[in-house]
Design a protein with these regions (language model features):
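Active-site microenvironments that recognize anionic phosphate/pyrophosphate groups
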Residues: 1-139, 145-196
């Protein structure tokens, strides 16, 4: 079962995907994301469709658990895995600058491609690591989800940006960056392109 359920308390959609509980624990001596494992070709970076997606291009009809108050919707969308490297134990910070460039190019390509689907309203690129958050694959990877809705937190951020602009005639993100740079206490790194 994969469906979206409206959560009236937080006024946001929640993904329900019971089939994800069936994800296997991989043997310690085999990894499907390593080229030698036989599931993926040789690669530097690779897009791989998630074997256990929470969102589907052809979702089933939701279970009959809805009424006027508890709404459900098909779990339309796309879930992709982005393999960072064929090296099984490397982490993102250990990748070379040129390799990270290839990864960013792939993220950009996938973002642009998923954004062409009129049913996808938000594209989320992320990495989660460790068994504690449910990661079953230790191989270095991230994910991209194409949501059929804009998550509430993102709606709030957009609303804050609009309201700040209407009130102050300036970009809120630009103002935050300006304040951080002037305050200096929280800036970790800065160059001509980025401030962290």
């Amino acid at each position: 079962m994969a469906e979206l359920r409206w959560h009236p308390l937080i006024q946001d959609w929640v993904m329900v995907a019971s089939h994800r509980q069936d994800r296997p624990q991989m043997p310690k001596d085999w990894c499907p994301f390593c080229p030698s494992g036989g599931r993926v070709p040789d690669y530097e970076v690779l897009k791989y469709d998630n074997d256990f997606p929470a969102l589907l291009q052809n979702p089933p009809e939701p279970d009959p658990v809805a009424n006027d108050f508890f709404k459900v919707a098909p779990a339309y969308g796309k879930c992709e895995v982005i393999l960072y490297s064929p090296e099984h134990t490397i982490t993102l910070p250990e990748l070379s600058d040129s390799h990270i460039r290839k990864l960013v190019d792939l993220w950009t390509e996938r973002f642009e491609e998923l954004s062409k689907d009129p049913k996808i309203k938000y594209v989320f690129i992320f990495e989660n690591r460790g068994e504690v958050v449910g990661v079953t694959m230790p191989h270095p990877h991230g994910q991209i989800y194409g949501y059929p809705f804009i998550p509430k937190k993102i709606e709030l951020e957009l609303k804050s940006c609009r309201e700040h602009y209407e009130k102050n005639n300036e970009c809120l993100i630009c103002r935050m960056l300006k304040e951080e740079k002037e305050f200096e206490q929280r800036v970790i790194f800065e160059n001509e392109d980025f401030t962290v």
